[in-house]
């Protein structure tokens, strides 16, 4: 049994919980009473084996299971006390020792019930104190899960806030073009307004100067004329750019209005000044001149546009008529050349027919000549082939005759040799028959046994005599064969 305390002093300092100790002792007594009751029931029903064998088996089981049961009970008690108050009760240790002292009284119980009791306590121990490593792992996984959830919620909130914020205006190709165009229009309008304001203020200053000083009337008139000239140039520029930009047209109209207002102010200033009467009249005449020049320029432009339209119409008619005339001329030329070609074709067909007939006749005569030549060549080739075949046959017959003659000579020589051999064999047989005996081979006789039978010994000389007398080359003889014995 493992002890988690450093020394006895600290062990004695731990608190004692009487309630848990009483509950534990009651559970142990209840389990022991149930086991005794079950043991008595089974002992009455079962048939016992021999006494010594059962006693030995019971001792072995008690020795193995006793320590396990004590260890499990102590572990369960320690875990319960640590979970409730974090301390250990000394009485639980005493109860564990008391259970150890009470164990021998249960030696009559069968090993089966002891194993059941051990399994129950083991299951309770597994439930009561899980492994600390698993608890730590679970705790760490729970913390990781909480951190992950917090991080995910923060990221989701940031994404939602970004989605709710207004998106930036990205300058794509089309947007850049539109923005640049709008900026350009705004700049032109501002410039026109500034010019009109400057122009208007200049006119007012000229009129005031003309009204206050008679001597400065001429200078005011000159300033007014310069301003008018500048306004005329701006107005002509606006008229030329009227088709390109509507905003510039509006700006030019504002300029003209300011210009008229300036003229009115100049006339009033000229009327108030007595000495500047001539200068005022000049300024009025100069003010009327831009309108006349503007109207004249507009009329001139309209006249030029009208003339251009007429020229365009004339040019369009000429452009339409010129291709038609060219097409008519081309068609006429093609018709003329076509008629000439047809006439030439008709004349050429007649000449071609005559030439074709002459050519056909010449081809026929050539074909006849070639056919004759071919027939002659064929006859010559056939004659030459026949002569060659005859020569080949003659040579072949000669070679066959020579071979036959040679074969006949060889056959005659062979026949003569065979005849001589036969004569020799006959002579030998006659000699043997005249001076020896005959023996018929029976059973498994051989030349060695035959020599022993007739000569008394089977020496190689006697065997060789029999061979020579019968014309044998080896020792092979057969049943029923007649052998001459010399």
From Swiss-Prot:
Keywords: Cell membrane, Membrane, Transmembrane, Transmembrane helix. Residues 2-204, 341-486 are extracellular. The chain crosses the membrane at residues 205-225, 320-340. It is a multi-pass membrane protein. Its main location: membrane. InterPro entries: LysM_dom (IPR018392), LysM_dom_sf (IPR036779). SUPFAM superfamilies: LysM domain. Pfam families: LysM. The keyword Cell membrane applies. Residues 1-40, 103-118, 126-149, 180-199, 247-259, 299-314, 361-398 have a biased composition (Basic and acidic residues). NCBIfam families: elast_bind_EbpS. Promotes binding of soluble elastin peptides and tropoelastin to S.aureus cells although it is not able to promote bacterial adherence to immobilized elastin and, therefore, is not a microbial surface component recognizing adhesive matrix molecule (MSCRAMM). This is Elastin-binding protein EbpS. The lineage of its organism: Bacteria, Bacillati, Bacillota, Bacilli, Bacillales.
């Amino acid at each position: 049994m493992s002890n988690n305390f450093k020394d006895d002093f600290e062990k004695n300092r731990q608190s004692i919980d009487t309630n848990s100790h009483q509950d534990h002792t009651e559970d142990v007594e209840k389990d022991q009473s149930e086991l005794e009751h079950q043991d008595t029931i089974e002992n009455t029903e079962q048939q016992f084996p021999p006494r010594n064998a059962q006693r030995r088996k019971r001792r072995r089981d008690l020795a193995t299971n006793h320590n396990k049961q004590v260890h499990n009970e102590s572990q369960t008690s320690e875990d319960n006390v640590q979970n409730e108050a974090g301390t250990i009760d000394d009485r639980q240790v005493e109860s564990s020792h008391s259970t150890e002292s009470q164990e021998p009284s249960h030696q009559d119980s069968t090993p089966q019930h002891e194993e059941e009791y051990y399994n129950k306590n083991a299951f309770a121990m597994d439930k009561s104190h899980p492994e600390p490593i698993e608890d730590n792992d679970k705790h760490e996984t729970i913390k990781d899960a909480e951190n992950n959830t917090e991080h995910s919620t923060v990221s989701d909130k940031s994404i939602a806030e970004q989605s709710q914020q207004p998106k930036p205006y990205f300058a794509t190709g089309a947007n850049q073009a539109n923005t640049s165009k709008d900026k350009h229009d705004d700049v032109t309008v501002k410039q026109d307004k500034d010019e009109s304001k400057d122009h208007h203020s200049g006119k007012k200053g000229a009129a005031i100067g003309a009204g206050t000083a008679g001597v400065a009337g001429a200078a005011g008139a000159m300033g007014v004329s310069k301003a008018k000239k500048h306004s005329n140039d701006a107005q002509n520029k606006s008229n030329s750019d009227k088709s390109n930009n509507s905003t510039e047209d509006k700006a030019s109209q504002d300029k003209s209005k300011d210009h008229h207002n300036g003229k009115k102010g100049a006339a009033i200033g000229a009327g108030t000044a007595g000495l500047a009467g001539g200068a005022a009249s000049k300024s009025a005449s100069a003010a009327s001149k831009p309108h006349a020049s503007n109207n004249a320029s507009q009329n001139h432009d309209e006249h030029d546009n009208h003339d251009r339209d007429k020229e365009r119409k004339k040019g369009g008619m000429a452009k339409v008529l010129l291709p038609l005339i060219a097409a008519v001329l081309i068609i006429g030329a093609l018709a003329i050349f076509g008629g000439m070609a047809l006439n030439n074709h008709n004349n050429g067909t007649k000449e071609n027919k005559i030439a074709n007939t002459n050519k056909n006749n010449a081809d026929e005569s050539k074909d006849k000549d070639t056919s004759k030549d071919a027939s002659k060549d064929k006859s010559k080739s056939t004659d030459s082939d026949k002569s060659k075949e005859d020569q080949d046959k003659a040579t072949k017959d000669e070679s066959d005759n020579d071979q036959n003659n040679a074969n006949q000579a060889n056959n005659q020589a062979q026949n003569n040799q065979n005849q001589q051999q036969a004569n020799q064999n006959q002579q030998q047989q006659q000699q043997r028959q005249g001076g020896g005996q005959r023996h018929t081979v029976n059973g498994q006789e051989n030349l060695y046994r035959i020599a022993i039978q007739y000569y008394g010994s089977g020496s190689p000389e006697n065997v060789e005599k029999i061979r020579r007398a019968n014309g044998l080359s080896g020792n092979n003889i057969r049943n029923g064969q007649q052998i001459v014995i010399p």
